[in-house]
Amino acid sequence: MTASALVAVLCVGVMPMTRVGRARERGETQGFMKVLVDAQTERILGASLLCIEGDEIVHSLLDVMAAGASYRVVQRAVHIHPTVSELIPTLLGQLVPLPPLPPLPPLPPVPPVPPLQA
């Protein structure tokens, strides 16, 4: 397998808490929600939930990750209103591709190992 075959196309969705009605209602608009998705498999690779109710939101994302299911499962789910987690479908609907990383420089040669002394 070549190195280029190992490169995944990643997508990211970010939502500031200033756009979340429940957070505005509580006056806790600091922070954000961010999700990283493999575009080819549609699997959620990770999330950063630096926000109010992040400890509750994470469970729906973890369930989809543990099941190896597509992010579309949680995107299409019915979320209760008014909650912070009701914005997960909107967050996942805003996924955009990340630019590819530059190639890594070649590794330096490995020096020879001296023979063992008896």
Model-derived features: positions:
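Flexible, glycine-rich terminal cap/loop adjacent to redox cofactors
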Residues: 4-118
